[in-house]
């Protein structure tokens, strides 16, 4: 039992995710098509009590929030080996969406295209590169933030987008080991402020 008169800080947070994923791979005429769907049920809960003393003025933060929503995803990726399997090209698309808000529920708002190439220079050395957009939800703390029991960020948040540009060399040391050196650039947008 906590004596609130003497309590300065108390924090309790829970993130519960129950997940389902189905994936299937098709192979035909040297092509490989990997497809899949996913579903998650998310529960987020936060209780924060914080007394902040600034120049003998007490600022009280007493916050409780519980959030439950569903996440969905679908993807497809097509790969093909060329030049006696020295070159592997791959392209794909993914969408993620959730029922947190109308904007986030539209799967067309969260399309993530990507392409990659891998070229074997020698039996042990290869050059790899990929370009793609990846999307992720904002932090649950931002999604679940409430004022006067209303989710104040619900209409302001969107998926965070990150464009990746990656290139590098991979060297196979043995059957079960490899070393890789890569350069990458990431460009983020949609981060909540």
In which residue ranges do the predicted regions lie?
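Face-selective signature of the C-terminal outer-membrane beta-barrel domain
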Residues: 1-104, 120, 177-180
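Membrane-spanning beta-strands of outer-membrane beta-barrel proteins
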Residues: 15-17, 69-71, 108-111, 160-163, ...
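Membrane-embedded beta-strands of outer-membrane beta-barrel proteins
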Residues: 18-22, 74-76, 113-115, 155, ...
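Surface-exposed extracellular loop regions of Gram-negative outer-membrane beta-barrel proteins
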Residues: 45-54, 124-165, 183-193
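Extended, folded domain segments that form the structural surfaces/walls around functional sites
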Residues: 65, 75-79, 100-102, 106-113, ...
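Outer-membrane beta-barrel "beta-signal"
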Residues: 116, 168-172, 176
């Amino acid at each position: 039992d906590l004596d609130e008169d003497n309590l300065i800080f108390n924090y309790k947070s829970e993130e519960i995710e129950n997940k389902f994923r189905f994936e299937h791979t098709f192979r035909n005429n040297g092509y490989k098509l990997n497809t899949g769907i996913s579903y998650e049920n998310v529960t987020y809960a936060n209780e924060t009590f914080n007394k902040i003393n600034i120049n003998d003025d007490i600022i009280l933060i007493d916050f409780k929030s519980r959030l439950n929503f569903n996440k969905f995803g679908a993807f497809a990726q097509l790969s093909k080996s060329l030049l006696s399997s020295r070159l592997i090209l791959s392209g794909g698309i993914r969408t993620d969406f959730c029922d947190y808000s109308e904007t986030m529920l539209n799967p067309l708002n969260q399309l993530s295209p990507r392409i990659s190439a891998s070229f074997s220079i020698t039996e042990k050395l290869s050059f790899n590169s990929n370009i793609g957009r990846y999307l992720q939800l904002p932090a649950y703390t931002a999604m679940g933030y409430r004022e006067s029991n209303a989710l104040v960020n619900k209409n302001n948040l969107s998926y965070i987008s990150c464009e990746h540009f990656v290139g590098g060399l991979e060297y196979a040391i043995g059957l079960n080991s490899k070393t890789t050196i890569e350069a990458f650039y990431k460009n983020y947008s949609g981060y909540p402020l």
